[in-house]
Amino acid sequence: MNFTKQPASLKYLSSMKLITSQDQDFFNFGEVSREFILEQAYVNGYDFHMLHQDMNCIGFVLSIFDEDARDEYEYKDLNCEYHENLFDAVVDSEFDKIWPHLVLKYITYYPCSLNWRGMPTIPIVYVSKHFWYELYRTGFLNKLYHCGSWTDILLLLSGDVETNPGPVETYKDLCRRKNIRKRKSRIREEIKMQQHIDKIIGQENEEYKIINVNMQGIFSFNEEKEIIKSTAWKFNSTLDKTNSIIDNLIPQLEETLAGFRKTYSKCESKIFGTISVVDVCVDLISALLQVSFAKPAMKIASLAVEVFRLIKKYVSNININIDKIKELLSYGKVALNNNNPIIHVTMQSNSPILEVLLQPNIIVSAIFIALSVVFHKKFTYKKLGIEAMIKRLGDLGRAAKGCSDLNVVLNQAITNHMLEHFGKNVLGLKQEDELKVLVEGYRNWCDEVRDLVGHKINSDGELDSKSIVENIMKDVYEIQRIENMYKKGLEISRNIAELKLPTKLTISFNTHMRYLTEVFKSVDTSGAFGNKPRTQPIVIWLFGESGRGKSGMTWPLAIDLNNSLLDNVDEMRNFSKNIYMRNVEQEFWDNYQGQNIVCXDDFGQMRDSSSNPNPEFMELIRTANIAPYPLHMAHLEDKRKTKFTSKVIIMTSNVFEQDVNSLTFPDAFRRRVDLCAEVKNKDEFTKMCWSKSAGKMVQRLDKGKVKKITGDIHSTVPYIVDLIDPESGEVYKTGLEYEEFLDMCLEKTSQCRDDSAKLNDFLMDYAEKRANRSREIDEVCARTMDEAFVDAYDDVIDVNMQIETVDEMELIEPNKLREMIEQCSNKIVYTYEGIAVKITSLAFKLATLNYEEQWEQIKEMKYYVKVSSGVNYLKRVLSQGMKVCEEWMKEMINYVKEHPWMTVSLILGTLIGILTVVGFWKWLCSGDKKKNPIKRHFINTGNVLILPDRELNTFWKNQESLDLRDMYINRVEEHIISLLKLQHKVVLVPKVTKYILTTVENHAKISDKIILITRNRYLNYQGKFVELICGEINQFFIDPETLDTNVEAFASADLKTFVQRKPIVIEGPEFVEAQTSGDQITLRKQTQKVIEAFASSDAITMARKTPKFVESDDVVEVSMQMWKDQVAQKLITNRVLTNLYKICLVKENGDMVPLLNGLFVRSNIMLAPGHLVGFLSDSDTIEIRNLFDVVFRVPWKDVKKVDVVNAFGESKEAVLLCFPKFVCQHTDLVKHFQDSESMSKFKRCEVTLPVLRYSDKMNRFLATLIECDKVEAYDRPYTLNDSSKGQYILRQGLEYTMPTTNGDCGAPLVINETQVIRKIAGIHVAGDARGKAYAESISQKDLIRAFSKIDVSMQIQLDLDQTLNFNQQQXIIPPNAEFGPEDLDFCDLPSLKMIPVGRLSEPLFEPGKTDIRPSLVYGKISEIKTKPAILRNVIVDGKIVNIKHKNLKKCAMDTPYVSKEMTEEAFQLVKSVWLKGMRNELKKVLTYEEAICGNDSSEFISAINRSSSPGFPWIRDRIKGTKGKQGWFGAEGEYILDEDVFEAVKTRIQNAKNGVRTPVMWVDTLKDERRPIEKVDQLKTRVFSNGPMDFSITFRMYYLGFIAHLMENRITNEVSIGTNVYSQDWNKTVRKLKTMGPKVIAGDFSTFDGSLNVCIMEKFADLANEFYDDGSENALIRHVLLMDVYNSTHICGDSVYMMTHSQPSGNPATTPLNCFINSMGLRMVFELCSKKYSALNGTKCYVMKDFSKHVSIVSYGDDNVINFSDEVSEWFNMETITEAFEKLGFTYTDELKGKNGEVPKWRTIEDVQYLKRKFRYDSKRKVWEAPLCMDTILEMPNWCRGSLDIQEGTKVNCENAIMELSMHEEYVFDKWSKVISKAYQKATGDCLDISTYNGYAQERFLNYYL
């Protein structure tokens, strides 16, 4: 059995792509495509079945596997034993001869097990799709299918050892050789096949214009060159094969072309007559060449000459109006643009660019080459090599096909479209087929009308409709039939109007329509005529969660209900004609024609308010009523006659609760609903999906399961319905199937129709009965004689005379008579004399005759039927009308056939098409431009600002306003002078007239500036007709109802700015410039698509068109020496420069090579040029560094790469780099990227490119702002080509001129235009030596599209814009000049390696005076060794020293990256220790009340401290006279739960669910404490940070249970939190530290805050989530909360900055988090020490898992004590631990700093200190004591806090000092207790309340040991 292992052919790969597809995907192809595939891949249908179905044989099943479900660990642990891993060997042996042998063994050794039926299971052998196809190709599947014994065929294929003793590889050898099985999957195979196919096809693509570029990154390509050299020999065989193919291909091509010419010449004369197409093509090409080669000034004249020459030659008999041609020759000044040279540039970006230039000369040359080959059998090429030959053949093939396609398209365009338009609109013609269909439908309709009314039309043509109406009104379905008939008549009427038929053709229709309308008016209950109450429609409301398939259920339900209203199957199939989809955003009911069903999808999505009501609610009330409802139509002729007549209204929405604010009685909306149903899905048809809005997994309809289970692409089976009362919300029926729900809908629909019909009957009867009700009052009056005489006529009876018409006799045709006789009906026919004869009697007489005799007699019979004269009248009308119509059709068709237009159109087709391409017709037909009004956002007169009125803009409500909009304009002009007051700042009028403007402007001169708002947007101003268009003013407001500025785009100039500030330099009387440019003056115009939350949602606003370019009418020109757009500068300095990093490659020797720039756009996700990915390998390490010296070094393999693609899935020259959380989070920039609306706003603009460049002079990176005043956007693809780096496609981007250089790629392109709100247009990707540069356009949607591929926990958002003041004036950064962080003044950064954010509007108050003071015994006990720390800035050597900045610098350190593998291994080991002893009572999220007040679940879940600071911003609202949080939670006693804090907590939690950080500002505060005198003199004051109380409460809710668990299991879990040093906890600690022997060390970390490693810290949230195990939603919340700890934002003075790694001391998890770092770090250090020692000495290497066998630790924060065994003490001791910690970035030192500078490798327990206490064993009481250091004890009495009474404070400290002395030896207690007592007695004259040595010991025993 020979298998093919060489690379597969392209044909095989192409067919394999389809063979390996799903069955349903295969059948989605067209019929022709499927036949071609089957022909290429299969022999017959039997083989197709074989390739797509499992092969069942005796004893086993052969099947195809899609994807291996095993994980990587199962692949690594491979066991080479038959029984355990034979299956893997079978799979690995594909395409090997041993495969059948292994299959046989696998079946033999397969363990026999029984299924649930007790039958033995059959082994399944899986093969890959490619090997399955190979088995099919070799005939194995066919043999297997027909074999009787599978053992025989397998032995035959594998080769019997006796008959074929050749060497066979053993199973174990194969298994060892292939020890890890390759994973295969459908996706991988399809991708590889598609890549191969794309590569082959790509070689045949048209050659684009190539721009040679140099990538602006610095890369090395030596390795790539070597690879190319080593693989070049592989192309030899390919070239040989190609030569042989070409030898066969060229003769075949020539033969094909010869056949084409022969065939074409035969049909040419028949198609084109005497005209030669070859001559036409040659003339056209000659004409174009003449024009192309003409001088620029003569191009138009040359074109005119060639056009006249062609017209004279081919169409000389046609008269042509040449006025435009004369105008062309006289005034044309613009020639065809033929000046499009190829540009040779040097790309300055790291990607090549491709540009397609459609130049006329290139087009003409291509056509000439193609035609020369096709018609003249010439093949022009130069000997450019075999590769060029192949490419040329591909070009010629496509060119030939392109000529054919062009001919087809042009002819179709002329004959099918242009002729049709000309005939219809000019000649009044119509296509024959369409006319036939129209006439046939018209005839059928006339027959129906005649059957209805024909027998009731009298001889005068009057219709007696009363009896007809009486019969119809008895049947509801008959009423519906009449209504459908009437609708059909309206449709025919519209067709007649569209066809513009002559009057003679419409007489018959109008006659029938008149009678039908008369009947329909009488029976109408739909309300179409508005003459009576209409049929009340049934209102069905479907609601349910998103993804339930409500819209999918709407269509079947609408069709079922529509079918109930129809009786014609054809009408039912054309269901879309009777279903109308209503969109309330469209103001008009366009195309509404009385459809039976109206659907309102996504009902109630628009927000409803009294000021901006949602029209859906009022519309529903109107449509669901019985009163006639005229609809708002766009066309005037439709307004008067279009009324709502639908029978069913179906609404769908996501929620049941609708917030209705615009109705005075909101229940009126719900009362209109007849059936309200919640749509759900059956479980078997659903799947679980992640909902970002809900922040959790939700159940949604799985369309794949629906198709799989039901077999249909759509079904109603998955739906179940719960019925809900729409008013009360009560559920009254549940679990209804669709059919049950449909029955209720049908019943309700029928009931509504019956009730409406009965109501009309009642009203008519009621009107008749009450006719004389008004005259009853006359009965009380006396009657006169004359009245009595008149009453004598009361006996006269009023009757309706029934006019009897004479019926006419109509002869029955023989065929009709035979049909009547065969049916043997009871009908009566008449002889000529009028004698009645029954059909049954005729049938009886003819029954005995044979068929031929019967037919002969029937043909001789003459019988008649009586027909009403009205019926005959209508028949004659119809006959005459049809006759006229047929004659008219014949005339029209003959006219078209005989008209020479067909011949002319073939000639003109090609000419018109080419002239269209070059834009000739657009120029020729252009006339004078329509005079449109000048569009402006505003008009500024200097004192008055005129704005258009918008309901969304209600800012004026906050000003003193005068609203005159509801007054008539003449009344406004009459009273405005008297109504205007000095306090009025805003005036609202219906229209601005010259008088009103003059009056308001005069008033403004004496008061202040006034905003004039007009409802009418058109006005005349200074002789110009102006239209005011709405600008996006609310883009600058957080809430449209307020004037609070929205700093999203850093705008500082709002309406307040206009009112309060005075104008500066003005160059024109119309314009005023505010002090910054981001005001409402230069806002972009409202666009059609409303995306932003503050954009208008009304239909009128949405309908406005967006201009393609920024219009300059609203630009304010001023004389200021500053940036054109201050907003752009602030965006760059405040945001872009903090997020912009230089990406560098780290060499093996540690040197760095700068590559390019990267911009963090969200969290730790960076946007970079796409070509970066191709030049880095997984073994590389990169370093990123920003302007502020923030540095991160990360392995490239740990960075996730996500391509940025456009809406069509095409990759852009950009990539998102998702860094590990080790890289700090950055502020969100996504909102500053352009959106689709802003992209369409500009074609040319001014831009700035901020770049980072290395300065050799300064030896660091500096920033430079490069400017360009002209940037052009393009939307065609460019290929960026770099000779050394390859090609990259730039699909959409920008081109500009800038002095860019290598390394500038990746810098963001910022638009420096005030009109553009979204400033970032893209990233720079290339440049050339001439200064041309190119940028890839990146929009918000591009980024969001890429974010969908990244886990939500990796894209946590942080937006600090709304919390800071960006309106402060900043120093101007000059362009093209280097600058560093010291040149930026928007933030006073404490140190480099921190990230600046901005400034607060005003700094926070901080006390600068200490609260510590000397006590009464100060200096009388011992020498003073401490003093209060410095709390304010000081002057040293004439310079001011900022104490905070000085002490915060220790946090500004770089930390190393810890590998994921090491971190994960340490985490798993720590988890097993920390999570011991869990209690379910603690594994829950605390409530808001429990987080504040505590609960009884644990003693460690205590109440919050009400005396500590509430944090920012709460500190600003602190109630005077209260301390800390007491103003919100009460001062003492029971806690008060404040509502404002509760709302803040809820908001924080909700944001965290959505992956958004609510800003937490940690306030840096100098700690008021005593420190050693030498440290105070060195200005070392510790800084602590407190956070907002709503964050602390939220953090306690989600973490406090876990922290309580740690405290309950203290010491045994390595954590000392909660340890009581006076209790048995100290004994327990000693036992823990002596577990591994006597050797211990105690150390602490220097600058611990600066060395914190985020790689370790972020795992703390994972550990807490493991403890709670309460779902992904809460897990995400904990990650978001913890990120505010290790990537914290701080306030220092008035400046706000971010730390790259942090641990604010005020967070509730400070100590547990530090303990976690200790436990994780020591395990990593253990492995590092072991590896180093093993490598040096060749000894056994211990792994991290051995840590718990040899080491025992306890830690409290950054303080720890380590006990280790003798076995590891040689390489795991104080010395080696210190060295290993340095690799992790920590500085670990001996706790006692060593004596004489020497640090021992280990100590004993008695020699170390922990928590500033020693370990002393009391031999008398057999316990371990924890004596405090003597220096600390003796220093305590010297100081006290200012809040206490000085004497009381001294006494308390002295007593505490003596109590601490009792834990030392007794002699120490006796000595110093006396000294302290005497000093206090001498100072105060009082005695201390103290106990004896034994007394204190007894007290500790009673309190803590019992």
UniProtKB/Swiss-Prot annotation:
It holds the Pfam family RNA_helicase. Residues 513-692 form the SF3 helicase domain. Specific enzymatic cleavages in vivo by the viral protease yield a variety of precursors and mature proteins. ATP binds at residues 544-551. Residues 1126-1343 form the Peptidase C3 domain. One of its GO terms (biological process) is proteolysis. It catalyses: RNA(n) + a ribonucleoside 5'-triphosphate = RNA(n+1) + diphosphate. InterPro entries: DNA/RNA_pol_sf (IPR043502), Helicase_SF3_ssDNA/RNA_vir (IPR000605), Helicase_SF3_ssRNA_vir (IPR014759), PCV_3C_PRO (IPR044067), Pept_C3G_Picornavir (IPR024387), Peptidase_S1_PA (IPR009003), Peptidase_S1_PA_chymotrypsin (IPR043504), Rev_trsase/Diguanyl_cyclase (IPR043128). The keyword Nucleotidyltransferase applies. Keywords: ATP-binding, Hydrolase, Nucleotide-binding, Nucleotidyltransferase, Protease, RNA-directed RNA polymerase, Thiol protease, Transferase, Viral RNA replication. It comes from the Viruses. Its EC number is 2.7.7.48, 3.4.22.-. Coiled coil: none annotated. One of its GO terms (molecular function) is RNA binding. Residues 1638-1772 form the RdRp catalytic domain. The keyword Cytoplasm does not apply. Residues 1124-1350 are annotated as: Protease. The active site is at residues 1171, 1213, 1305. Replicase polyprotein contains helicase, VPg, protease and RNA-directed RNA polymerase functions. This is Replicase polyprotein. It comes from Acute bee paralysis virus (strain Rothamsted) (ABPV). The lineage of its organism: Viruses, Riboviria, Orthornavirae, Pisuviricota, Pisoniviricetes.
